[in-house]
């Protein structure tokens, strides 16, 4: 197996694991979410105890499903958590939809929908005010898009620009790969079109996208989830 995986190679590994019965999609998503929290606490030990506040950005696919697992697990640990959902939950993949429902059932008042595919300026302003306005957010998690993204995120520009404008107000964590970073590098020329990660938590092996976008990834931690 190569030391660095492409998106298609990683998906093939996951499919083989599912087909063999070694793990289900829900189990793998739970492991991924827990591994992000483990990496976060390893990287920022002061966050492992006490009360903290996280904002989770969840996208329309399985990366978003990982985000809902992270939200739920942090909430159970006593964190204040708010989720911004950039998706129609009814169109999410089955396992991601199941984790969306688990989160909403647990904390129905802590999820904010934002327009998909194009975020409205007023929504981005509200996101900025709620996420950064009081200066108390500790962690912003990017669970919008994972590996294999091949199109610019023009509809998300207002959110990405807000994150960059508040770059030093929180610890920014990307799940698998910073959103806006494709396999061959950034999908757009502007630096602010890629989520500004301090920590990127990826699974099983480093990915080609990381190698072609190291300056956007911050610290890269590889977590093993049983594939």
From Swiss-Prot:
Its EC number is 5.1.99.6. One of its GO terms (molecular function) is nucleotide binding. (6S)-NADPHX binds at residues 62-66, 146-152, 176. NCBIfam families: yjeF_nterm. This is NAD(P)H-hydrate epimerase. The keyword Transport does not apply. K(+) binds at residues 63, 142, 179. The keyword Isomerase applies. Binds 1 potassium ion per subunit. Its cofactor is K(+). Keywords: Isomerase, Metal-binding, NAD, NADP, Nucleotide-binding, Potassium. It holds the Pfam family YjeF_N. Residues 10-227 form the YjeF N-terminal domain. Catalyzes the epimerization of the S- and R-forms of NAD(P)HX, a damaged form of NAD(P)H that is a result of enzymatic or heat-dependent hydration. This is a prerequisite for the S-specific NAD(P)H-hydrate dehydratase to allow the repair of both epimers of NAD(P)HX. It is an enzyme of class 5 (isomerase).
